[in-house]
Amino acid sequence: MGNVENKLRVEDSSIHDWYRFVLSFPPHLVQQYLETFCVDQTSFVLDPFCGTGTTNVECKKHGVSSWGIEASPLTHFVSKTKCVWANDTFNFLNTAKQIALAAARTINSLSKPRTLSEEQTSLILKNSICEQPLSSTLVLRDSIRAANSPFEDYYLLALAKHIVYSYSNLKFGPEVGISRKKKESVDVVEIWLSEIERMETDLEYWKHHSSTFADISLGDARSIPKRDYIGKVDCVITSPPYPNEKDYSRTTRLESVILGFINTKALLLHHQLF
């Protein structure tokens, strides 16, 4: 397996690129393992360190049932959302357009920018995000939640992706750092809505496998939750974490704070233990 190219191929990007780590292993590696181990639609696959759900999404694309376990609340949210494929794509897109209009109106009427609390600000890297993109992101986040939509998780996932890659000053090489070139002005809502349109296209394309089973558990793989699944597992495909080398919470810190997965130093310390 050493000759497998370690990057996301364009032809594999649908759903996987809704949100993924810079260090994620590529979907075609999972494809190769499924073939090598003769995994078919009667099989049950486990990824005990599923991260952003590469194994589980790829299994679902192939009609293979799977189970993932993830200790981080943010990445659990990511992988769980990526593994539930909505069928009502018409309302999915229309609701997003309504949210975008509401957010844009609020942004245009603000008398002063919205900010994080002092404690929240202390949790993120200094200069992670500039004032205008942050303010607009907070407005859009609140507009998404105010809509009380069944598609809320998808909308927040799209926001999480672009907090990192379009709105912030973060760079990955592969460790997270701050770019010298700052993004002072960003059309947060337009970028987000474009992402929703891409997600809608993916959901429409893959709807024939929307019912394929995929369950993502929040927990520590060392104390297995949902033990009733254990006897069903035919194959394990995973990439174990390297806790002595990587602080995974640092990589996802900004979006975790903005979306509320981490809002105190105590919670941050807890996440760093995994």
Where do the model's predicted regions map?
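Conserved proline-anchored active-site loop of SAM-dependent methyltransferases
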Residues: V30, S43-K60, S66-P73, S79, ...
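Residue-level marker of regulatory loop/turn positions in helix-turn-helix DNA-binding domains and
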Residues: V22, I129, Y229
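Phosphate/oxyanion-binding active-site loops and adjacent basic polyanion-contact surfaces
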Residues: V22, P26, P133, W192
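S-adenosyl-L-methionine
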Residues: M1-D40
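SAM-dependent methyltransferase catalytic-core segment centered on the flexible catalytic loop
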Residues: Y242-F274
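SAM-dependent nucleic-acid methyltransferase catalytic core
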Residues: L134-T238, P243-T251
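Non-catalytic nucleic-acid substrate-recognition regions in nucleic-acid-modifying enzymes
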Residues: Q32, T36-D40, V57, K61-H62, ...
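Glycine-rich, phosphate-binding/catalytic loops in enzymes
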Residues: H62, V84-W85, D228, D234, ...
